[in-house]
């Protein structure tokens, strides 16, 4: 089964169709996962008004419970094993912020969707490698796969392709897919400096990771391109084919 547009249309979760009082489980409480939790907790009332129903965190899973995350876990169940989040009958939505295309994140995605739980992820690698399988699994179990944050973080690229441009024939997709590469290439072009020197500057400024291969080897951009191609053209294009 390919990444057809219809599968991704159905996979995107429409909040207004969900039952009242949504119970949420979050897997992964790093920088991004913790911020998701803080937003859900600190803006609980505003979000309930905005979406028309309560969004309540009932369970989380992460590596280290002792880390100070600037929000209370007192009324939230903790699991060392993320897979257990998919077994809770009261959980409506599982939010995955673990990362990685295989392993724990993929197992959790499969288990959650198989049990009819809606699945939200920012994991571009997993969607790029396994999007067809997960979208098909979501459809088969009347669940919804949401991955807006996996591409162009603060820009609603998925929603735009799914809804705003649904009546258009898209012939071309272009854009800056990786900020680290864009910074490095721009500096090399304008200053004439070599790659290693500009990369070191990017790392010092926080634009590049200490281990930058995911960005500079094109892996991150390839993952994003696989997702955008699927959404824009309904094509079955895997990461390995790019």
Where are these regions (language model features)?
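N-terminal glycine-/serine-/threonine-rich beta1-alpha1-beta2 phosphate-ribose binding loop
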Residues: 13-115
């Amino acid at each position: 089964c390919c990444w057809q547009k219809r599968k991704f249309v159905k996979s995107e979760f429409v909040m207004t169709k969900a039952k009242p009082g949504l119970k949420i489980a979050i897997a992964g409480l790093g920088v991004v996962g913790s911020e998701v939790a803080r937003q859900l907790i600190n803006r609980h009332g505003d979000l309930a008004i905005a979406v028309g129903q309560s969004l309540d965190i009932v369970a989380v899973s992460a590596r280290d419970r002792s880390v100070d995350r600037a929000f209370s876990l007192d009324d939230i169940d903790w699991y060392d094993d993320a897979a257990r989040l998919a077994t809770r009958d009261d959980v409506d939505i599982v939010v995955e912020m673990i990362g990685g295309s295989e392993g724990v994140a993929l197992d959790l995605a499969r288990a959650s969707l198989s049990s009819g739980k809606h699945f939200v992820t920012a994991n571009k690698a997993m969607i790029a490698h396994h999007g067809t399988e997960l979208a098909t699994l979501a459809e088969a179990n009347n669940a919804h796969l949401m991955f807006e944050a996996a591409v162009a973080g603060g820009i609603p690229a998925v929603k735009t392709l799914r809804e705003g441009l649904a009546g258009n024939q898209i012939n071309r997709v272009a854009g800056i897919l990786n900020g680290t590469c864009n910074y490095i290439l721009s500096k090399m072009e304008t200053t004439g400096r070599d790659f290693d020197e500009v990369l070191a500057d990017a790392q010092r400024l926080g634009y590049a990771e200490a281990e930058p291969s995911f960005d500079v080897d094109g892996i991150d951009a390839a993952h994003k391109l696989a997702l955008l191609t699927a959404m824009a053209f309904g094509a079955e294009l895997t990461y390995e084919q790019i």
